[in-house]
């Protein structure tokens, strides 16, 4: 079933929340095969995960025996593995834009699940109210949009047909090829943005929480 707040934010595009139709099937098939090409679900992704774990270990060791919150470290690591496939690069944990985007994603999820914003699912027009959590939610979505669209723009400007670097490059090349053959294509930068958003918001939150629960369990039961 369609969830109003999700439908408004995603414009019914992407691969996670889009309606089942021929366009969705094409987008999902391409996304799945391309992500597998870059290692998703394969052993070839393992070196990237191991490489990122080195940064995680360094961050944890900085705290010594002091208590610390592992959430931002794990969130950074998971996001960087996704970045390596989608953007062809990782971000330093101290990168201001990267930290801001992760904070925005976390805040969007928190506000959408634990505030009056939930009422949008009953009265969709509430989404456009210019105050309170409604305004904060919209602004956070706009800021995330600006960050991701800037990444896509940078890829378009530096695109090399002979050497696609990552998911975004492959998507742009596929879009250009379809337009050249058919004159038009359902593959466009607008749809690409929502797919990248799906990868980050759905992938980062679920994987991070799974790892955090695993860390908690191992901390409470170190011998098991």
Task: State the predicted function of each range.
Residues 206-224:
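Cytochrome P450 catalytic-core helices
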Residues 39-51, 61-84, 92-100, 125-147, ...:
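Cytochrome P450
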Residues 49-53, 74-82, 196, 200, ...:
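Hydrophobic alpha-helical cores of multi-pass transmembrane domains in eukaryotic membrane proteins
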Residues 1-45, 69, 74-81, 97-126:
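Cytochrome P450 substrate-recognition site 1
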Residues 36-40, 65, 115, 140-211:
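Conserved cytochrome P450 catalytic core segment spanning the I/J/K helices
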Residues 45, 49, 151, 155-156, ...:
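Juxtamembrane membrane-interface segments of multi-pass membrane proteins
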Residues 22-30, 48-55, 77, 100, ...:
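Generic alpha-helical secondary structure signal
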Residues 84-94, 177-179, 218-224:
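Short helix-capping/linker segments at secondary-structure and domain boundaries
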């Amino acid at each position: 079933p369609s969830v109003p707040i999700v439908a408004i934010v995603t414009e019914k595009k992407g691969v996670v929340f889009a309606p089942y139709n021929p366009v969705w099937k094409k987008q999902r098939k391409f996304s799945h095969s391309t992500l597998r090409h870059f290692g998703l679900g394969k052993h070839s992704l393992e070196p990237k995960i191991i490489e990122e774990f080195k940064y995680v270990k360094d961050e944890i060791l900085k705290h010594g025996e002091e208590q610390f919150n592992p959430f931002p470290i794990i969130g950074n690591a998971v996001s960087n593995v996704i970045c390596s496939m989608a953007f062809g690069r990782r971000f330093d944990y101290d990168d201001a834009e990267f930290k801001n985007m992760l904070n925005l994603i976390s805040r969007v999820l928190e506000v959408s699940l634990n505030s009056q914003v939930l009422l949008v699912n009953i009265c969709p027009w509430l989404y456009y109210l210019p105050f309170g959590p409604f305004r904060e939610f919209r602004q956070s979505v706009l800021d995330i949009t600006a960050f991701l669209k800037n990444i896509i723009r940078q890829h378009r400007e530096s695109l090399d047909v002979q050497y696609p670097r990552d998911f975004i490059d492959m998507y742009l090349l596929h879009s250009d090829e379809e337009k050249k053959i058919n004159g038009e294509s359902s593959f466009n930068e607008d749809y690409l943005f929502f797919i990248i958003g799906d990868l980050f918001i759905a992938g980062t939150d679920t994987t991070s929480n799974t790892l955090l629960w695993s860390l908690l369990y191992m901390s409470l039961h170190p011998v098991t």
